[in-house]
Amino acid sequence: HKYIIIGLKMGKTLVIAEKPSVAGDIARAIGGLKKVGDHYEGDSYIVASAVGHLLELKEPAEYEVKRGKWSFANLPVIPSHFDLAPIKKSETKLNGLKKLLKSKEVDKVINACDAGREGELIFRYIMEATKNKKPIYRLWLQSMTKGAILDAFKHLRTDAQMQPLADAAKSRSEADWLVGINGTRAMTAFNSKDGGFFLTTVGRVQTPTLALVVNREEKIRSFAPRNYWEVHADFKVDAGVYEGKYFDPDFKKSSDPDLKAERLWAAEDAQKIADAVRGKKGTATETSKPSTSSCPALYDLTTLQREANSRFGFSAKTTLSIAQALYEKHKLLTYPRTDARALPEDYLPTVKEILSVVAQTSSLGKFAQKALKDNYVVFTKKIFNNAKISDHFAIIPTGQEPKSVLSEVEQKIYDLVTKRFIAVFYPPAQFLNTTRTTVVEDYHFCLLYTSPSPRD
């Protein structure tokens, strides 16, 4: 018998990341890949990248010449379909990806662009422009550690699973184009009708946000100050001196937010009270009520930006940039562009692993150790809730040890996230809210103070 042996060569998988640095991280996680030009290649994988957006929707004039003129007569501009045009500065990168996609060696494609709507759009536009017909899968990264990358490769999402996100991304892009192009040209034409050219930009997000700022500014300008008086008194007791503030015990809430129990609207009324109680003895009574204060939920991007602005004066853009560096460069935080403040319900073991690393490597280690030692880290729906997460969960540490010294601002954001991650497992703080009411000549004065109550 004669046998013919045919060697079958397995195809390669092309992985497309959003930026070169992420492509490098993925290539190192896979292992065994060599740098070839601007991509990485091995026996089974080719890892390449975009540089952000490589394509954009065409300008109106490219659909119909007259639509390029900025006048009311040529509005609205509503194409029957949207076409793509390469972005000039990144055309070389697009051509490189086209070549890889058309390679006979490549038999499937993995989308490893950022795990969100914009990353999905970047990849989908590349697929549309290159007319790719090869099978597509999605690498959905929650963090950039080697372990997280390899785990994501074990749980690739199908093209069908990602279609709703792709549709949302394209719809958002086309809506921005329609509102931006038509709104900007209409407002510019209106403001330029008496001569000149007065560019007036309009945007789907920009313009409503501007309206919020304008409304607030109008309220500030129309604000009419009203003078009011308060009466404060110092009371001497054996233990020292305490201060009380006059209030009207018969006060009832009004629809006027300026009216409050402690406010007096005539100077003579305040003076009358001061004269009546000066140098007189009073009777004091106290009532205390226990209260608790729980840690707020884990951070999403918006709450992290607010906190960083409040504590450090960082702008929203600065905080995002720092968090992105801690995610991509340092691998210390999970994906930052999230709107979720909870974790998956099966994440308890992972949380304990992360806290164990934090306990050994962070300046906050003693607090992480206590949380683990005293069994604070337990399942609770406030923290672990699948209904409160979508494509991403809350921003938390990855459990990776810092491999380089963080900058001052990076350390601040990392510590902020780590503190919240530890604190959310601690039991609520316990307080006593005390009200001390002092009555002098039938006038009431109030002192409110809060003190921590000891735990059993």
Language-model features and meaning:
Residues 3-181:
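Intrinsically disordered, low-complexity regulatory segments
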Residues 46, 54-87, 99, 197-324, ...:
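Long, highly charged, low-complexity internal segments
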Residues 11-12, 110-115, 194-199, 288-297, ...:
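Conserved short loop/turn motifs at secondary-structure junctions
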Residues 166-169, 176-178, 329-415, 451:
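Extended, highly charged linker/hinge segments and catalytic-adjacent loops that couple domains
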Residues 452-456:
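A short, hydrophobic C-terminal helix/tail in secreted or cell-surface proteins
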Residues 149-228:
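C-terminal or mid-to-C-terminal helical accessory/interaction module adjacent to the motor/catalytic core
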Residues 142-148, 301-302, 322-333, 337:
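Short, conserved phosphate-binding/catalytic loop or strand-edge motifs used
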